Amino acid sequence: MGLREETAEKHRIAEQKEFNQRMFRGELTKEEYVNYLTQQSLIFNQIEFGNNLPSDSLRRSEKITEDLKELKEQENYIVLPSTIEYVNYISNLTEEQLLPHIYLNYLALAYGGQMMKSKVPGSGRMYDFDNMMECVGSIRAVQKDEWSEEVNKGFDFLIEIFDGLQNTTGPNGK
């Protein structure tokens, strides 16, 4: 089986998390989306800090910062324990070991993010890629089926993050 098939179950679970579903339906408040962006900022800053990406046009940190500046009204942001765990985990990986997490996080923005951009508060700069095909191609060029275990670990972290974000919003998402 290939990478896509080996990670399909975790991908499905992550997509079906209530917070993620609410984001796809355009139901997040500005505060909830800012909390999501805060987690994304920490993850992408760690991935990009001192690491070579398959393409420089993949870089998201500055765009996430622009989104946060646009939406920022609150001073206290939630940083989830699961986000700290994921950031700590990826901080201990070599550049080669980090590639499955680049695959997971950047392709999620490249594909799912294009549907999400019109549903979230603000401009959604995080989802803007200067050359989408080149960005996706740069990841596909280094992609390996052997990444499935590591991609599934990344999904486990993201599933926990989605659960944590949902738990900060209350049982009905408000």
Predicted feature locations:
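Metal- and O2-centered redox machinery and metal/ROS homeostasis
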Residues: 1-174
